[in-house]
């Protein structure tokens, strides 16, 4: 064991994260919440979809709502490139795809190298942030995946998913026209 590994052990439990870039900042997500990282693909836009949803993709038969983190974080839109990735994550037992500018690597940050979030980190409110990890000469903003979406947005996603399942033809959604929930469906849902 080298001195760096001993130092990491002394700092406590290692946090394994997928690191990625949005705008000028590097972020990290708990690797256990990430299902996979894929290249950007065609996103099917949905009429009347909630504003935070870019659209949906079909990933091996699963319809996954897509959220662009640039939009979510209030950053200027940027055309997708060959480095653009979709990180598929589990949010409250639902798969959601998050578009990022680039996915970097798996990083390990000792618990002792993670500080509480500052009042504002990378222009983000601390509601999304779990902490800031120090890794060599850089800082990684650790996102709290459960707070990326508000409770209202999670309800909207569930309604959208229900509507998609109800309108999907037998045999799946491949090639089918899919509609987002109408305002009537949204308004007739249970109050939260």
Predicted regions, residues:
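An acidic, low-aromatic, low-complexity terminal/linker signal
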Residues: 1-192
């Amino acid at each position: 064991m080298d001195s760096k590994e001993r130092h990491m052990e002394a700092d406590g439990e290692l946090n394994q994260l997928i690191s990625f870039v949005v705008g000028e900042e590097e972020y990290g997500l708990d690797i256990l919440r990430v299902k996979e990282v894929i290249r950007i693909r065609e996103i099917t836009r949905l009429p009347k979809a909630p504003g935070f949803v870019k659209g949906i993709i079909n990933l091996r038969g699963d319809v996954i709502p897509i959220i662009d983190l640039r939009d979510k974080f209030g950053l200027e839109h940027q055309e997708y490139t060959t480095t653009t990735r979709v990180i598929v994550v589990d949010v409250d037992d639902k798969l959601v795809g998050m578009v990022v500018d680039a996915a970097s690597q798996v990083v390990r940050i000792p618990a002792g190298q993670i500080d509480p979030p500052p009042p504002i980190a990378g222009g983000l409110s601390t509601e999304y942030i779990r902490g800031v990890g120090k890794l060599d000469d850089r800082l990684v903003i650790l996102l709290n995946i459960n707070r990326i979406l508000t409770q209202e947005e999670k309800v909207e996603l569930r309604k959208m998913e229900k509507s998609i399942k109800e309108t999907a033809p037998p045999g799946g959604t491949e090639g089918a026209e899919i509609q987002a929930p109408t305002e009537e469906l949204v308004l007739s849902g249970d109050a939260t």
